[in-house]
Amino acid sequence: MDPEGFTSGLFRWNPTRVMVQAPTPIPPPQQQSPATPQTAAFGMRLGGLEGLFGPYGVRFYTAAKIAELGFTASTLVGMKDEELEDMMNSLSHIFRWELLVGERYGIKAAVRAERRRLQEEEEEESSRRRHLLLSAAGDSGTHLALDALSQEDDWTGLSQEPVQHQDQTDAAGINGGGRGGYWEAGQTTIKKQQQRRRKKRLYVSETDDDGNEGEDDDGMDIVNGSGVGMERQREHPFIVTEPGEVARGKKNGLDYLFHLYEQCREFLLQVQTIAKDRGEKCPTKVTNQVFRYAKKSGANYINKPKMRHYVHCYALHCLDEEASNALRSAFKVRGENVGSWRQACYKPLVDIACRHGWDIDAVFNAHPRLSIWYVPTKLRQLCHLERNNAEAAAATLVGGISCRDRLRLDALGFN
């Protein structure tokens, strides 16, 4: 027997078997220790108050006593300031727990901060959704979903013509064999939208100030109701209509215009109710806060420039409805446009101010439907000018001339 054959048959050398190593076993994942019943009960017992009151110096035992009364963080956020004060008084009377002065202010400050945080989260979420919608519309390569953005803008000067020209250019590039046309078009559209939104935010931050509420906006081109800084469709223009007449075609009548002022009054009442519930400052006139609330409620057709533009026309409608109706009928018969009718509404108001000692502000404040509106600057200037003219004319005559006599002379044709 060959010893070499026996050895080679018994011990076979396999290099691959030596190189392969057994895989190391994977250690089982470490299981987290389950929360003890005491820990879970601790978090449920406080109801989120520890995170709400933590940075405001409220003691732990105070938060525990509030939680024992059945209050949670969500409950406190939805309460008014008067209700918070009642809760703290109940805490002192029931548990005989002495609240520190800083704790009382800290509880109110924590609730206000939580309200602001929730409101900011809602605004960020809505802006994020709006940005996603605009981005999706820009990537699709079509401007059909962006009718509001492609409409003509009074401030930026944009119109549909550049958009159509861009679409034609992109189509020509794609038909010419360039596959980057859609991508370039989408990037260009997104950049334009971002620039437009940035400019609108800057403009709104400059003009959206409640301190300048008394200023008139006569110099703005808002006959069609196009507000600056708002993404809305251009509305139908107004035409002169008689009382009870419905405008035909894509037009709006004057009855609809006066109805918008009644809606603004309702929105003001809603804003006042919300402000009282929150313990905030309650507006007494139609301010930017009311217009923002109207837009948030879906009434995009109500905007500050348009309502300030025709407020003196609405004032004439409230103070002397017969004169307003007669003026509307006369301009309707003559076929005058709404701009001429708007200018003609100043003179009757100046005459009304003359009968009340030229105090047009007192005339507005005395009327329940006009007291919520600011007096237009132009109307106040006309009253001041007419008053100076009347005083100068009275100084030249012996004994002077009264306002009633001046109106009688105007009626007879002696101007």
UniProtKB/Swiss-Prot annotation:
BP terms from Gene Ontology: regulation of DNA-templated transcription
Annotated tissue distribution: Acts in the floral primordia.
Intracellular or extracellular location(s): Nucleus
Biased composition (Gly residues): 174-183
Region (Disordered): 159-221
InterPro entries: FLO/LFY_C, FLO_LFY, Floricaula/leafy_C_sf, LFY_SAM
UniProt function note: Controls floral meristem identity. Is required very early in flower development and may act here as a transcription factor.
Family indicated by similarity: Belongs to the FLO/LFY family.
Name under which the protein is recorded: Putative transcription factor BOFH
Organism expressing this protein natively: Brassica oleracea var. botrytis
